[in-house]
Amino acid sequence: MHFSPPLQKGTLLKRYKRFLADVTLEDGSVITMHCANTGAMTGCAEPGSTVWFSTSDNPKRKYAHSWELTQTQAGHWICVNTARANALVVEAILAGEIPQLRGYDALSTEVKYGHENSRIDILLKSDSQPHCFIEVKSVTLLDEIQGDKGQGYFPDAVTTRGQKHLRELAEVAKDGSRSILLFAVLHSGIEKVAPALHIDANYSQLLKAAQEAGVEVLCYKASLSKHEIRMVSEVKFAHQVTKN
């Protein structure tokens, strides 16, 4: 996924009201931009961090600029625009870069499904195998406090929406379709992923139950720069549970 036109650079002053951020440009002026991230953004939104943003030519947008990447003072790159994760995974699937998801004939996005009025991020279909339902989650929380280098967690805040998605995925698996939770690692410092029991215990418990019901968990890491984002490698998920 190439950024075109090229991203512009600034310095973060503050993020506020969840969806807004004030950024100082290189000429000293300050602009307000949209932040497409509903999470806590722990470690991703420290004042003084370098931010990279895109600009839309859509005149109907209230804020023309969108915060895309953070470059931390520790040198890490983070994609904070969670909308990029789904597009990145779709791109990787179509290019055959995720071996576990090869062999399907059709791909759809944002398809209604389930009993709780949900939409699945990606639906793969094939005449020769069951449908494959894929829910994509961005992983940007790096926590090395315990000395565990490269440890990433999801979620970074309590997520009732994420809990609902796990229930829906579990039901799909029980009905005989293939059901996948795919963690897209969008932080250059994260080398492995674990459920954030210390942040959302209910999510962790539901994830374990979903795996026992047959939900698969995949973790793929992206390479990040101001020029492009692309999936490059599979990383370890720390709590794989086998189906009952």
From Swiss-Prot:
HAMAP family xrefs: SfsA (MF_00095)
InterPro entries hit by this protein: SfsA (IPR005224), SfsA_C (IPR040452), SfsA_N (IPR041465)
Protein name: Sugar fermentation stimulation protein homolog
CDD domains reported for this sequence: SfsA-like_bacterial
Gene3D superfamilies (UniProt xref): 2.40.50.580, 3.40.1350.60
UniProt lineage: Bacteria, Pseudomonadati, Pseudomonadota, Gammaproteobacteria, Vibrionales
Sample GO molecular function, one term: DNA binding
Domain of life: Bacteria
Source species of the chain: Vibrio cholerae serotype O1 (strain ATCC 39315 / El Tor Inaba N16961)
One family name in Pfam for this protein: SfsA
Family: Belongs to the SfsA family.
